[in-house]
Structures are given as C-alpha cells and as structure tokens.
Amino acid sequence: MKNNKFALLAIICVFSIQSFAQKKSKKDDLVTIKTEQGTMHVILFDETPKHKANFIKLVKDKFYDGLLFHRVIEGFMIQGGDPESRDAKADVTLGKGENGYRVPAEFSPKLFHQKGALAAARDNNPAKESSGCQFYIVQGKKWNKADLAKQVARATRKVTEEQKAVYETVGGTPHLDGSYTVFGQVVDGVDVIDKITSYPRNDRDRPEKNIAMKVSVKKMKKKKITKKYHWNYQS
C-alpha cells in the first residue's frame, strides 16, 4: 500500500509540473473505450488533475484492457475497472477489487452528473476519496421539475439553474453531485451506455453477458475535438 501511495504521488507531481503548460496547450487527451456494443470517446477535465493523471497512467499501462463493466443499472450507470473482473467466471461477485490506493476527492461546481459523465467509484470513506481504478459512466434519466427538486435536495452541493436544465433535457443522476468526483465526459457514443444497460443482469447487477472493454488514449488538437465531437472548451 505504501509503495502504491508513492506511485500515485509521483503521478500527481509529474502532472502538476505540466499543468500550467497544458492549460495553454492546443491539444488534449482523448480517451477511447471500445466494447462489443460500440465505442465511446471521452475527454478528461483539467479541473480534476489528480484523477486525469491517474486515469491516463492506467490507460497507458493497459490496466483496463479486458476488464468488465461488472455493475450495470438501467436508468443509473455502468461501472467498471475492477481488476478482478478480467476472465471472471459468471457466478463471481465483482466490485471489491482495487489497485492499492485511493485518489483524493476533486469537486468542482462546474462538473456534474449529467448523462455521459465519467466519475470515480468509491467506498464509504469520510473524505470521499475515490477508488484508484474503478469508475462509472452515468446514464441516469430525464427529470421533471418536481422530481428534480427532490433529487437536488439529496445532493451535497448546490446545483445551478443551468445544470438543472441539463438534467431536465439530457438527463443524469443529480443526487450524486458533491459526493463522487466527476472527472470526464463522453463526447461521442453515448448510445453505447443505453445498449449496455439494456442487457439482462443477475441479482447483483452483473450483466449475464460479459461486457469487456479496451481503453486507449491519444493526443488530439482541441480544434479537431470540437469540430468532430462538438465539445466546446471553456477559456
């Protein structure tokens, strides 16, 4: 555990040295998550540098290749990243596997659980530190004003009017805001989430069909990302 903590610290330090230059960089990291159900493209937020650096490191190390989306709940999210899920037998309960460290929580009022949000899973710890490897992607649902008000009341931080509008028109899981770190967003292939959540699952929410992933990352010009995926970078 101690060695793993030093490894995470090294990742964070390297990222911190580069962070100023990256803010002015004309390129960004584009993550590709491939499954039999389709491909998702994801951008990672500079507002969550520890999570971004950690995720990119794991992707480059091919940590996620062959792992499963082991927990799938329609109208909520798809979860993966458990290292014990690789080649796991159908009757095995998954979700407890870790890589030996946590990532400190990184909350930003600009980042929220809209549909397609990439967020870090975690256990029940008071600091809300994230799993070092497990993540989920939000499906959620669209909310009417009355039900949304109840959901927002459960959130541990203020949800803005602009964010409420997104929850009403695009969908998401507003009650998780302020409790789990959102560190990325699916910018292409959101329909893949719906395909994955449509699969039958057992009483532990594991899909009856194994849904494996292959994850890669590459640098791409921000202008190209904006043009191809309609993602607008804020200055």
Residue locations for each model-derived region?
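Cyclophilin-like peptidyl-prolyl cis-trans isomerases
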Residues: 19-235
